[in-house]
C-alpha cells in the first residue's frame, strides 16, 4: 500500500502541470551484455554467468522549477552460476534495501532470473537558492574515489564496478545555497526495516579547499563527520572521516572511527595515479575474512573494510585516444591479502564500448581477500 501511495503522489504532482507548460523531456540509457567467468578459491571448477542489462533514465522538466526523474534497471541473469548458488544468489539480487520494495521478479528458475528495479523515482523543486528532492534518489556525500566514510545514505561499493549509478534511497533532501561555494543540506531516509538515517551537512570553501561537516543519526548510531578536497602543488588531496556511537549503549561504548585519505595526480601525458588509505578503529589486526560475497554485500560506512587498515593504489593511462588501460589494487598489511583489478577499455564507436577486466583476490583462507578466487569480465555496452 505504501508503495502505491508513494508512486501515486509522484505522478499526481506531475499531472498538476498544464500540457502547454511542458518544457523538456529526456530519455537516455544503455544496453549491455556482461559475461562473468569465476574461478573460485580452493576448487578447480570454473563457473559462468551472463547478464543482459538495460537501463533507462527519464527526466521531465515541466516548468523551470520542477524536475521529475525515474531510473529503471532491467536485468536478465542466466548461466551455471545462477544454478550453482540457487536460491541464495537470486534472493540477493531481488533484495531491495529501500523503504519501498521497487524490485520486481518477472520470471525466474534455478538457472535464470529476469527482474526490474526502479532505483530512481523522485521530484525536485527549486525556488531561488532552495532545492527539495522527494523520492528515491542518490544522496552522495562522499568525496574520495574509493572509500567514503561520509556517504551515510548510499555507500559506494568499490567492487560493484558495473553499477556506476549506485542504488537510491527513499529520502527527502533539502538544500539551501548560502553562497556561491557554500550550502546547507538536510536529508532523511527510511530503509526496508524502517530504520532512520538523518543528518545535516554544511559545505563551504576556505582558501580553495572545499570543506564539509555533518552530524545526525545513521540507524542506531549517532554520527558526526567531516571531509575536505583541495590541492597541494597540483596534487589532489582529499579526505573524509566519520565517528559512530551506538545510541542504545551511549555510555558504555567507545564508538567507531572510520577515516580515509586520498591523493591523486595527472601527468602531462595523461598518466593518472591515485593512492588512498582507510582506517577503521573497530577493524581487526588479524585475518579479516569478509564473510559474505563482496559484490553483493550492502555496505555502509562502518563496513567499508573489516581490517584496521587498508591501502589502495591505481594507475591508468590512455594508450591511444580509444584505448584506456588501468590497474588498481588493495592491500591489507595485517593479513597480507591482496586484491588486483586490471582492466582495458576500448571505445569501438561513439556509443559502443568493450570492457575487459579482472578482479583477482589473493591470500590465505579467512583473510580479507583470500577466499574469493579470481573473476574475469567481458562487457559490450551500447549507450543511447
Language model region names:
Residues 20-42, 70, 182:
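Transmembrane beta-strand segments of Gram-negative outer membrane beta-barrel proteins
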Residues 25, 64-68, 129-132, 181-184, ...:
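Repeated loop/turn-to-beta-strand initiation elements of outer-membrane beta-barrel proteins
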Residues 29-35, 70-74, 134-136, 186-190, ...:
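Transmembrane beta-barrel strands of outer-membrane/channel proteins
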Residues 46-52, 114-119, 126, 166-170, ...:
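Residues that define the transmembrane beta-barrel architecture of outer-membrane proteins
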Residues 58-62, 124-127, 176-178, 203-206, ...:
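Residue-level signature of outer-membrane beta-barrel architecture
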Residues 65-181, 363:
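Outer membrane beta-barrel
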Residues 231-330:
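Detector for outer-membrane/organellar transmembrane beta-barrel domains
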Residues 313-317, 346, 352-353, 357-360, ...:
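Outer-membrane beta-barrel "beta-signal"
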Amino acid at each position: 500500500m505504501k508503495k502505491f501511495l508513494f508512486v501515486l503522489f509522484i505522478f499526481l504532482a506531475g499531472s498538476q502541470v498544464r500540457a502547454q507548460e511542458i518544457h523538456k523531456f529526456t530519455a537516455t540509457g544503455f544496453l549491455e551484455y556482461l559475461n562473468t567467468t569465476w574461478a573460485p578459491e580452493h576448487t578447480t571448477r570454473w563457473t559462468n554467468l551472463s547478464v543482459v542489462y538495460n537501463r533507462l533514465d527519464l527526466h521531465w522538466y515541466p516548468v523551470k522549477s520542477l524536475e521529475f526523474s525515474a531510473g529503471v534497471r532491467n536485468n536478465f541473469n542466466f548461466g551455471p552460476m545462477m544454478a550453482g548458488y540457487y536460491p541464495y544468489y537470486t534472493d540477493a539480487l531481488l533484495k531491495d534495501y529501500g523503504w519501498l520494495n521497487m524490485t520486481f521478479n518477472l520470471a525466474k528458475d534455478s538457472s535464470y532470473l529476469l527482474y526490474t528495479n526502479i532505483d530512481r523515482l523522485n521530484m525536485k523543486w527549486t525556488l531561488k537558492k532552495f532545492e527539495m528532492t522527494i523520492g528515491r534518489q542518490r544522496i552522495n556525500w562522499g568525496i574520495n574515489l574509493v572509500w567514503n566514510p561520509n556517504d551515510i545514505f548510499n555507500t559506494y561499493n568499490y567492487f560493484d564496478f558495473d553499477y556506476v549509478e549506485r542504488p537510491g534511497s527513499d529520502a527527502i533532501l533539502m538544500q539551501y545555497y548560502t553562497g556561491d561555494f557554500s550550502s546547507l543540506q538536510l536529508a532523511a531516509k527510511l530503509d526496508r526495516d524502517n530504520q532512520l538515517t538523518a543528518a545535516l551537512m554544511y559545505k563551504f570553501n576556505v582558501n580553495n579547499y572545499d570543506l564539509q561537516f555533518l552530524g545526525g543519526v545513521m540507524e542506531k548510531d549517532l554520527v558526526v563527520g567531516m571531509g575536505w578536497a583541495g590541492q597541494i602543488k597540483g596534487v589532489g588531496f582529499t579526505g573524509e572521516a566519520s565517528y559512530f556511537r551506538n545510541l542504545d549503549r551511549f555510555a558504555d561504548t567507545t564508538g567507531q572511527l572510520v577515516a580515509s585519505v586520498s591523493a591523486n595526480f595527472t601527468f602531462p601525458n595523461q598518466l593518472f595515479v591515485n593512492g588512498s588509505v582507510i582506517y577503521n578503529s573497530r577493524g581487526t589486526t588479524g585475518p579479516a575474512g569478509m564473510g559474505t560475497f563482496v559484490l553483493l554485500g550492502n555496505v555502509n560506512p562502518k563496513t567499508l573494510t573489516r581490517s584496521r587498515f587498508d591501502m589502495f593504489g591505481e594507475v591508468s593511462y590512455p594508450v591511444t585516444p580509444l584505448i584506456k588501460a588501468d590497474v588498481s589494487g588493495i592491500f591489507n598489511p595485517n593479513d597480507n591479502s591482496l586484491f588486483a583489478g586490471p582492466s582495458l577499455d576500448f571505445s569501438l564507436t561513439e556509443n559502443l564500448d568493450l570492457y575487459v577486466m579482472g578482479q583477482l583476490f589473493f591470500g590465505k583462507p579467512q583473510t580479507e581477500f583470500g577466499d574469493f578466487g579470481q573473476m574475469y569480465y567481458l562487457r559490450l555496452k551500447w549507450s543511447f
